[in-house]
From Swiss-Prot:
One of its GO terms (molecular function) is NAD+ synthase activity. Catalyzes the ATP-dependent amidation of deamido-NAD to form NAD. Uses ammonia as a nitrogen source. This is NH(3)-dependent NAD(+) synthetase. It comes from Burkholderia mallei (strain ATCC 23344). ATP binds at G51, I52, S53, G54, G55, I56, D57, S58, T168, K197, T219. The keyword ATP-binding applies. Homodimer. It catalyses: deamido-NAD(+) + NH4(+) + ATP = AMP + diphosphate + NAD(+) + H(+).
Length: 284
């Protein structure tokens, strides 16, 4: 791909993902807190629900949600934020999860261990005759089951509390398609949408997060065989490079092509379910 064509695609993708050419942390916090508060009030809902993993994305989204419901209560509208701990058995980074909760200061915290449900599903699939190519493939499938069990738990609480599920997706994860479809990608409201990873970190700092939380190595931590595997190992490039791509900064052509390959391969994750009328590969 020529450089002009590559640059044009970068601009188009950044616009699609709502990445602004400018950024002010205080302004963005105000916009996003107001968005969540307005959404709840307009929809007549009373709660926000979010799983807090111990990473910077869920911590930042959780703090924004907590501030939004506090704003609503100050205006006379009753709303609460429910933070959920959703470990698969013992959590490797338990201390980080506790640090995140201390930053978020949620109205309420519920803990649900997804291990029994995830393991039961894996066993039920085996009993039904599903076989895997190897242990690595089985572990990959189990990882996605974990993410989807967490989604089920959050929606169960949201349903019981007349609330919405808050998602943690932002532009850097979205462009790479780095989320489980109908797992952590399943949510009602995305307060971090349009932000690059460095901007999420800047927003967290402005909101008062401490540096160990802000700078924690991002990991989905879904694989049992490779616990705490950094996101960047899966990408083969860094978040700094992904952010440069989205923010229109100078970068190596090969790195830009890597981002474009991930973007093209994961288009289905950013779309609603296809019909014959809207799938690009099928003439309507």
């Amino acid at each position: 791909m020529s450089r002009p064509d590559q640059a044009a695609r970068r601009r188009a993708i950044a616009a699609e993902l709502h990445v602004s050419p400018t950024f002010d942390a205080r302004d963005e916090a105000e916009r996003r807190i107001g968005f969540v508060a307005d959404y709840l009030r307009t929809a007549g809902l009373r709660a926000c629900v979010l799983g807090i993993s111990g990473g910077i994305d869920s911590s930042t989204a959780g703090r924004l949600a907590q501030l939004a419901v506090e704003r609503l209560r100050a205006s006379g509208y009753d709303a609460r934020f429910v933070a959920m701990r959703l470990p698969y058995g013992a959590q490797h980074d338990e201390a980080d999860a506790r640090r995140a909760l201390a930053f978020v200061r949620a109205d309420e915290t519920l803990t649900v261990d997804v291990k029994p449900a995830a393991d039961a599903m894996l066993a039920a699939l085996a009993a039904g005759g599903l076989a895997y190519l190897d242990h690595a493939q089985q572990d990959f499938v189990l990882g996605n089951i974990k993410a989807r069990e967490r989604m089920i738990a959050q929606y169960a609480v949201a349903g019981a509390r007349n609330g919405v599920v808050i998602g943690t997706d932002h532009a850097a994860e979205s462009v790479m398609g780095f989320f489980t479809k109908f797992g952590d990608g399943g949510a009602d409201v995305l307060p971090l949408a349009g932000l690059t990873k460095r901007r999420v970190r800047a927003l967290a700092r402005m909101l008062g997060a401490d540096e160990p939380l802000v700078l924690k190595t991002p990991t989905a931590d879904l694989e049992t065989l490779r616990p705490q595997r950094p996101d960047e190992h899966a990408y083969g490039i860094t978040y700094e490079q992904i952010d440069d791509f989205l923010e229109g900064k100078p970068m190596d052509d090969a790195v830009a092509e890597t981002v474009l390959r991930f973007y093209d391969a994961t288009h289905h994750k950013r779309a609603l379910p296809y019909t014959m009328f809207d799938w690009p590969g099928h003439p309507a």
